[in-house]
């Protein structure tokens, strides 16, 4: 719903602009010369038919480009990009309230699918008894859900770059809810495990694409504040899953209510997405704008980058899958971070099965109270927020230094920086001469609102600060896991490892 209204608003803006500037819609006959300079009659006829007519003046943010299609035929298009630094249609220029709301909704979505990953661990004894299997087999409900995450992540990213963020969120969440419901109705353990795996496949897009949504809304410096917020809230899902199901299956409330609770929670988040979440993927918004420009002007040459660079869905998905393995092989830093993240998630989800052995077998706590112990773990996750102001200050100074260095270099070479929104190659008639290629990502990368790119290593501050906490916490836990100690030291050991989880993410 919100995406549809957003599409309508873009159309209203385009129509109003053309009503205020009627000269943008005036036309003259196109050139009769081939872009290569040939002037043969045959070439002239072909080029005239191809170019037809063009606007006398192009709207802001539209540039004329000569391109060659897949068949080798040259053609001219009007490439649609952001109008200016403060283009209101650019997601990074939404109001602060709108951007925070969108970030919180994505965080709530990640919380819901994250909670579904761990909530079954709270009712493993009841699940095993109901299906007459061992608790080890029943614990596969959690493991297969995570395998579904891994499988779905290969496809969800490329899909969001074709269909947009909201389409992937809504479509995947709908299927996720269907399979969660099927898991709750499963008549045997085999059916439940199969449906849990499929729920994981369709539950992964919020986690895979959420980083893209955050990047759509916030510039690199702002992400130093907003991404930890998203990480702290989203990591609350796996932690609070067992807390939500603490006493399910032990009284009148069936253990199957773990699925119904997740279904209700997912439905509420779905309502928020439909009613409040705007589309944030910039290339798709520009595609919508180009479609409205074609409709208003009748000129089919208005195109966005997505229209010009047509890549089949299957080809894009295969390319994304290949890229992940290629980067892992050729980029050691990606391989190392991936392995480290794997270890961290192994530690996190090992706790789901390990806590009952510690707090029930050693300290004699009840099943429900053992699940509530997970609240202490979230304190450690939230504590990672204490590092945010410190790292933000370091990051800000890094960006300022990079910007200052860039300005000095530009001044020393005598290069006049191009002001976004003013194309020095455009004449008074809106015609374009030879132009340099825009940087990847369009003019938004040169947006003066966005800080100059700094060193990639700058993003490792959080990771370096949090890395020591994993071994400290695990050593602490092993050292105090004896009946002669009270449960208090064990509760405190949950803080350090979970602080690390957020800082690494």
Where do the PLM segments sit?
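Intrinsically disordered, low-complexity terminal tails of fungal membrane proteins
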Residues: 1-95, 281-320, 394-457
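Extracytoplasmic
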Residues: 98-135, 351-356
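Helix-breaking motifs and short loop linkers at transmembrane-helix boundaries and internal kinks
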Residues: 116, 131-132, 155, 163-164, ...
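Extracytoplasmic gate region of multi-pass secondary transporters
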Residues: 121, 326-379, 385
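Conserved MFS/SLC helix-loop-helix module at the cytosolic interface between two early adjacent transmembrane helices
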Residues: 151-190
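Structural signature of the two symmetry-related core transmembrane helices
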Residues: 167-181, 403-406, 412, 447-448, ...
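Cytoplasmic helix-loop-helix junction between adjacent transmembrane helices
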Residues: 195-233
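Glycine-rich segments within core transmembrane alpha-helices of 12-TM secondary carriers
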Residues: 222-250, 265-266, 380-385
């Amino acid at each position: 719903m919100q995406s549809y209204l957003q599409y309508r608003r873009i159309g209203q803006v385009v129509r109003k602009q053309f009503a205020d500037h009627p000269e943008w819609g005036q036309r003259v006959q196109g050139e009769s010369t081939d872009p290569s300079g040939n002037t043969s009659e045959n070439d002239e006829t072909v080029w005239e038919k191809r170019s037809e007519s063009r606007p006398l003046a192009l709207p802001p943010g539209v540039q004329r480009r000569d391109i060659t299609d897949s068949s080798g035929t040259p053609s001219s298009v009007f490439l649609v990009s952001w109008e200016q630094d403060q283009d209101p249609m650019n997601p990074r220029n939404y109001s602060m309230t709108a951007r925070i709301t969108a970030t919180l909704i994505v965080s709530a979505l990640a919380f819901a699918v994250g909670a579904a990953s761990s909530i079954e661990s709270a009712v493993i004894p009841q699940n095993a008894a109901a299906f007459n299997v061992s608790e080890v087999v029943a614990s596969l409900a959690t493991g297969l859900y995570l395998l579904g995450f891994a499988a779905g992540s290969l496809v969800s990213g490329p899909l969001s770059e074709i269909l947009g963020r909201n389409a992937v969120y809504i479509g995947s969440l709908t299927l996720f809810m269907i399979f969660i419901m099927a898991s709750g109705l499963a008549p045997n353990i085999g059916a439940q495990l199969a449906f849990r795996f499929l729920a994981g496949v369709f539950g992964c897009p919020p986690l895979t694409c959420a980083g893209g949504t955050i990047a759509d809304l916030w510039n690199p410096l702002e992400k130093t504040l907003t991404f930890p917020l998203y990480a702290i809230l989203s990591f609350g899902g796996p932690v609070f899953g067992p807390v939500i199901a603490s006493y399910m299956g032990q009284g009148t409330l069936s253990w199957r209510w773990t699925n119904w609770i997740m279904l209700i929670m997912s439905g509420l988040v779905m309502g928020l997405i439909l009613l409040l979440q705007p589309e944030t993927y910039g290339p798709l918004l520009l595609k919508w704008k180009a479609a409205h420009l074609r409709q208003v002007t009748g000129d089919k040459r208005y195109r966005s980058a997505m229209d010009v660079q047509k890549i089949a869905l299957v080809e894009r998905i295969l390319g994304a899958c290949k890229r992940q393995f290629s980067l892992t092989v050729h980029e050691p830093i990606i391989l190392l971070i991936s392995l480290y993240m794997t270890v961290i998630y192994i530690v996190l989800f090992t706790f789901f099965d390990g806590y009952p052995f510690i707090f029930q077998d050693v300290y004699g706590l009840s099943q429900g109270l053992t699940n509530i112990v997970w609240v202490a773990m979230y304190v450690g996750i939230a504590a990672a927020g204490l590092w945010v102001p410190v790292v933000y200050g370091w990051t800000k100074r890094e960006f300022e230094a990079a910007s200052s260095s860039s300005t000095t270099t530009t001044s020393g070479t005598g290069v006049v920086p191009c002001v976004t929104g003013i194309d020095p190659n455009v004449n008074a008639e809106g015609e374009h001469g030879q132009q340099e290629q825009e940087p990847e990502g369009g003019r938004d990368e040169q947006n003066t609102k966005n800080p100059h790119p700094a060193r990639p290593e700058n993003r490792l501050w959080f990771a370096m600060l949090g890395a020591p906490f994993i071994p400290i916490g695990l050593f602490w836990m092993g050292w105090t896991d004896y009946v002669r100690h009270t449960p208090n030291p064990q509760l405190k050991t949950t803080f350090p490892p979970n602080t690390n989880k957020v800082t690494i993410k």
